[in-house]
A protein has these predicted regions:
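Flexible nucleotide-interacting loop at or near the entrance of a catalytic core
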Residues: 142-200
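ABC ATP-binding cassette signature C-motif
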Residues: 1-151, 200
């Protein structure tokens, strides 16, 4: 409660603003802070919004978002359409930023340099680990390897239980009925197991 959350959109809506300055200074921002950030990131705020390039629009959006003094920054593809100098400037700013930020990005270098925690949307589920993106590949390999080991163990146990069932259950003893129920449960568990994406 009381935290200021600011979204840096992937495609800022500039159609109702004549200039980048009009856009960047709209809302609850300090104009001199916007101008200072714009100077640092290298954007001419007097450019007309309609003719500004994607990179210029992105820089104006960054100046606006950072000047809002957020507690939490939501970054949607923050390095998209930026040149190397602007990306480096943003990385430097974020490395000194004392608030929190959540980034959705395909820029692996950006994520590796700045992140401390990773959320992985995996086959319909969510996983979280306190590692930066630099450790993501090792983490996924570890998860998939553990899943494969679990599946192998379950397959071996299923094979034994299926063999027991095929030999025939001679009596309706509670023990046998319980074992059959457990077998059905194992079958369902195995059927629900998914391999890594791209496997069947």
């Amino acid at each position: 409660p009381g935290s200021r959350i600011v979204l840096l959109e992937q495609e800022p809506a500039l159609t109702r603003f004549t200039t980048l300055r009009d856009y960047a200074t709209a809302g609850d921002v300090t104009v001199h802070e916007v101008v200072a950030i714009a100077d640092q990131i290298g954007i001419d705020l007097d450019r007309e919004s309609a003719t500004a390039s994607g990179g210029e629009r992105r820089r104006a959006a960054i100046a606006r978002a950072l000047a809002m003094d957020p507690d939490v920054l939501l970054l949607d593809e923050p390095t998209n359409q930026l040149d190397l100098s602007a990306i480096e400037w943003l990385e430097d700013w974020l490395s000194r930023y004392t608030g929190a930020f959540i980034a959705i990005s395909h820029d692996r270098t950006f994520l590796t340099r700045l992140t401390k925690s990773t959320i992985w949307l995996d086959r319909g589920g969510i996983r979280r680990k306190d590692i930066g993106f630099g450790g993501f590949d090792a983490w996924t390999d570890e998860v998939y390897a553990q899943e494969a080991r679990n599946a192998e163990r379950l397959d071996a146990k299923l094979k034994l239980e299926e063999h027991w069932l095929l030999r025939g259950v001679t009596a309706r003893r509670a023990r046998n009925e319980g074992r059959k129920a457990k077998l059905m449960e194992m079958r369902a568990t195995r059927a629900a197991m998914m391999g890594p994406p791209g496997t069947s």
